[in-house]
Amino acid sequence: MANLHQQQIIDKIQNITFKDGTFLNEVISDIIIKGNNIGFSIDISGKNKLEAEEIRLKAINELNNIKDVNNITIVFTQKKTIDKKAQKPKHFVENVKKIILVASGKGGVGKSTISALIAQQLSLENYQVGIVDADIYGPSIPHIFGINEIPKTVEGRIIPILAQNIQIISIGFFVKAHSAIIYRGPMASKIIYQLLSNTRWNNLDYLIIDMPPGTGDIHLSMLENYHLDGVIVVTTPQKISEIDVIRSIDLYRKLGLPILGIIENMIYMLESDRCGHLSKKYNIPLIAKIPIIPQIANACDKSLPLTNLLTLPLEKYL
């Protein structure tokens, strides 16, 4: 047993996962090797205890395949949870059934285009749909939908602009074209609250939120303050995009938001299977791989429906 090391343990249990997609390797710690005996801890915070016991037995079964191992000790640990009574209640958005975030780890991956496509496709399927352009530092939705007007207000509530039968609100409606938008984190979060909760939505089945890139204050504010139904993550084949999207996955999992799937955009820019790898590693569905289609840019510039060019298998994931 002198040659036994931690990597052997990690390798043996690398394919064991919880039902929520968490790999066992991600939640183990305190690996101890003493002679023929090995042991470690599993953090089961937020996990079902019966499932955790099944995972423990699977791990023991795999580790028994290591030559000469005698005793295997696996203990459960759990992080101290915050008293639910002390947690701030989350907001529901009036007249909205489901809220879906569209997010990315980095900018420039086509997130706003995908948000528009999802909304347009759902609308064609006879759902009532709205979009909040929450990318307040670079709002693109007004351009994609060809909107150049300022929304009206009635009794202090904003009336969303209707375009292609989709109810739309964006910070871009309230600033001059080509003007820089500069907000600190708290102010940015306050603006998102105004766009969401101070808009008079008309009986929406789906509200699609085009999020800013990254994992900053706006993301935390949304996750902590609103009842959300899931997030779709958009990425591209580059390695840097993969690194950033992993950070996003980590954020949403830590805060308990279901990740509905990954969309890989512009896949012919680089030949790779990065998203296939991410999908398998994190047990997240790969919704679609979208090639570079020059007509998409033209459709966005001319405010034409993107559904004329491609569709997504949304019924499986939303």
Swiss-Prot record:
Swiss-Prot/TrEMBL keywords? ATP-binding, Hydrolase, Iron, Iron-sulfur, Metal-binding, Nucleotide-binding
**Classification via SUPFAM superfamilies:** P-loop containing nucleoside triphosphate hydrolases (SSF52540)
Q: Which residues bind ATP?
A: G105, K106, G107, G108, V109, G110, K111, S112
> Which Pfam families does the annotation name?
ParA (PF10609)
- MF GO annotations: 4 iron, 4 sulfur cluster binding; ATP binding; ATP hydrolysis activity; ATP-dependent FeS chaperone activity; metal ion binding
- Which Gene Ontology terms describe the biological processes this protein takes part in? iron-sulfur cluster assembly
InterPro entries per record:
Mrp-like_CS, Mrp/NBP35_ATP-bd, NUBPL-like, P-loop_NTPase, YlxH/NBP35
Q: What does this protein do?
A: Binds and transfers iron-sulfur (Fe-S) clusters to target apoproteins. Can hydrolyze ATP.
Annotated family? Belongs to the Mrp/NBP35 ATP-binding proteins family.
Q: Which PANTHER family match?
A: IRON-SULFUR PROTEIN NUBPL (PTHR42961:SF2)
* Subunit structure comment from the entry: Homodimer.
Mind telling me what this protein is named? Iron-sulfur cluster carrier protein
Gene behind the chain: mrp
